[in-house]
Amino acid sequence: MVELKAPLTTLWRGKDAFEEVKTLQGEVFRELETRRTLRFELDGKSYFLKWHKGTSLKEIVKNLISLRMPVLGADREWHAIHRLHELGVDTMHGVGFGEKGVNPLTRTSFIITEDLTPTISLEDYCADWAVNPPDAQVKWMIIKRVATMVRKMHAGGINHRDCYICHFLLHLPFTGREEDLKISVIDLHRAQIRQHVPLRWRDKDLIGLYFSSMNIGLTQRDIFRFMREYFSLPLREILQKESGLIHQADVKAARIKERTIRKNL
């Protein structure tokens, strides 16, 4: 199965897309046993390629023991991108997808997306907020936009599984005006798509977002602002209904922080 969009429909017409993918050269961003991420140029534009080369039995068993679905190919990200566009959530633009093989251990697949440039991750954009606070209106504007994006994503049946601020890209130039604000969510290769997002997975995304923004100087008021936008309810009602999530977020964020510190020792 192969799906191509412009310019690949023209450049690769009559050719084997899998053979063309093998010849692509560029900057390697990640090289794993079963996955390769490459940035390359084609016809004067920059793109990203994710090349999946099956998986190992060890990886499948490890994920199943952890009650997680292993990433078996590029199809999950391809479908998530299209679903987010349907929901009105800014994300990558997919221009190519291919998959062949039935056996998950040997299945080969690829996805090609446009390089979102110029952009900066929110992790980098907000890195010095704790010491150099931004204009309050700009901060609240970004908080509101991220909350709206995640709300739409979850309402549309998608949970990210790696929902951290480093996976939200702010498009540049950004002047501080709302009409210039565009944020795209990326790295959807582990995303899950269902009719409804289970509470457990909704909470995992929200906790990941909370943890990844702990060091950028957000106040309790900022967090409440996010919650009001995400849940679309009065704060008092949110605090009553979501007390379990709030407690879980504090406990899990502290646990993740401890684990991160131990890994860096």
UniProtKB/Swiss-Prot annotation:
Transmembrane segments: none annotated. Pathway: Bacterial outer membrane biogenesis; LPS core biosynthesis. SUPFAM superfamilies: Protein kinase-like (PK-like). The active site is at 162. Belongs to the protein kinase superfamily. KdkA/RfaP family. Disulfide bonds: none annotated. The keyword Nucleotide-binding applies. GO terms for molecular function: ATP binding; kinase activity. The keyword Metal-binding does not apply. It catalyses: an L-alpha-D-Hep-(1->3)-L-alpha-D-Hep-(1->5)-[alpha-Kdo-(2->4)]-alpha-Kdo-(2->6)-lipid A + ATP = an L-alpha-D-Hep-(1->3)-4-O-phospho-L-alpha-D-Hep-(1->5)-[alpha-Kdo-(2->4)]-alpha-Kdo-(2->6)-lipid A + ADP + H(+). InterPro entries: Kinase-like_dom_sf (IPR011009), Lsacc_core_hep_kinase_RfaP (IPR017172). One of its GO terms (biological process) is lipopolysaccharide core region biosynthetic process. Kinase involved in the biosynthesis of the core oligosaccharide region of lipopolysaccharide (LPS). Catalyzes the phosphorylation of heptose I (HepI), the first heptose added to the Kdo2-lipid A module. Keywords: ATP-binding, Kinase, Lipopolysaccharide biosynthesis, Magnesium, Nucleotide-binding, Transferase. Its cofactor is Mg(2+). It comes from the Bacteria. Its EC number is 2.7.1.235. This is Lipopolysaccharide core heptose(I) kinase WaaP. Disruption phenotype: Mutant shows an almost total lack of phosphate groups in the core oligosaccharide part. Mutant is significantly more sensitive to polymyxin and shows a complete loss of virulence in mouse infection models.
